[in-house]
From Swiss-Prot:
Residues binding [4Fe-4S] cluster 1: C21, C24, C27, C216
Residues binding [4Fe-4S] cluster 2: C31, C197, C200, C212
Organism field: Dechloromonas aromatica (strain RCB)
Segments for region (Disordered): 101-121
Stated name of the protein: Perchlorate reductase subunit beta
GO MF term set: 3 iron, 4 sulfur cluster binding; 4 iron, 4 sulfur cluster binding; electron transfer activity; metal ion binding
Uses described in the biotechnology field: Has potential use in bioremediation of waste sites contaminated with perchlorate, a common component of solid rocket fuel which is a widespread environmental contaminant in water systems in the United States.
């Protein structure tokens, strides 16, 4: 029998403008320092920023399966530890304080890591391209992890829609790890329990923005309640319709959205002629965000041109985010 989920009264929602993310990993570090420094959590990055196109973290997560197909829950694969990147250490003491002269090498020898293929992208100069894709638990409207859990340890908070794993009820079945198509629940081998992003709900309860959002140096991230018509997330998703979920075909109805990137045209064709083709192939963006991305890119281009001509654009003003307080719950860190 499927677990019964009570619909929340409100839904906390995130939007990231991929045109402003600089890949600095400040959100990654903020989350790591706040939530995953305990035993068995070395390999966990509840929030990570990966280069697209690329293998991602864990490696090849986009093909692991899970989610829903025709409304039916799908079983995916549990990523092996090597796909997350086995944590490695440097002999800092030997090099810095004991006078060892040989080259310091990490141990064990690294084979993968959360940002293993950072900045590689695809294509050949001068038409090579990539962009950064920050990822976290999507706190889905239809969370596959919740339905899959055999111990009813996962629930969606009534007051804000954040999806949480009840640590006392979790028995380490890993059904959530298997069923999430975004690979965002993690199995803690020390505690024998699943861990995942908690949406910084202790901060939300105090009226403070999540750590990842508050620390974003590029003001690329927005957070708020989707029913708040004054919030930037409502405006970007519902009013201007320029923010899209990642892989909507997975069927979980994510509550983390993205403004797709616009990198402009290719520099030149193989024959040396100038090109008007987009540097990021449209098919690549459609593979991530669905067919609607074409319409969104057209809207963004139109509004950008308005600004360039000195005309008003409410949408661009929201995306510029001159005041952090307009983009999030209190930005206090």
């Amino acid at each position: 029998m499927a677990n019964v989920m009570k619909a929340p009264k409100r839904q906390l929602t995130y939007v990231t403008d991929l045109n402003k993310c600089i890949g600095c990993q400040t959100c990654t570090v903020a989350c790591k320092k706040l939530w995953t420094t305990g035993p068995g959590q070395d390999f966990m990055y509840w929030r990570n920023v990966e280069t697209t196109p690329g293998l991602g973290y864990p490696r090849n997560w986009q093909t692991k399966g899970g989610g829903y197909k025709n409304g039916e829950l799908q079983k995916g694969k549990i990523p092996p530890m090597i796909d997350y990147g086995i944590p490695f250490e440097f002999d800092y003491a030997g090099r810095l304080f004991e006078g060892k002269k040989e080259r310091v090498r990490p141990s064990p020898t690294p084979r993968s890591a959360p940002n293993w293929d950072e900045d590689q992208g695809a294509g050949e100069y001068p038409n090579n391209s990539f962009f950064y894709l920050p990822r976290m638990c999507n706190h889905c409207t239809k969370p596959a992890c919740l339905e899959a859990c055999p111990n009813e340890a996962i629930y969606k908070r009534e007051q804000d829609g954040i999806v949480v794993i009840h640590q006392d009820k979790c028995k380490g079945a890993q059904a959530c790890v298997q069923s999430c198509p975004y690979a965002k629940p993690y199995f803690n081998p020390v505690a024998n329990k699943a861990n995942k992003c908690i949406g910084c709900f202790p901060r939300i309860e105090q009226g403070v923005a999540p750590g990842c959002v508050a620390q974003c140096v590029g003001r690329a991230m927005h957070v708020g309640f989707i029913d708040d018509t004054n919030s930037s997330v409502h405006k970007l998703i519902r009013l201007y319709k320029v923010a899209l979920p990642l892989h909507p075909e997975f069927g979980t109805e994510p509550n983390v959205f993205y403004v797709p990137p616009v990198l402009g045209p290719r520099m030149e064709l193989p024959n040396g002629e100038l090109s008007t083709d987009p540097k990021i192939p449209l098919a690549q963006l459609e593979g991530l965000f669905g067919k609607q991305v074409r319409d969104v890119l057209a809207i963004l281009q139109t509004e950008r041109e308005k600004k360039m001509k000195g005309l008003a654009s409410d949408l661009m003003d929201v995306l510029i985010g001159r005041r952090s307080a307009d983009m999030m719950i209190s930005p206090l860190t």
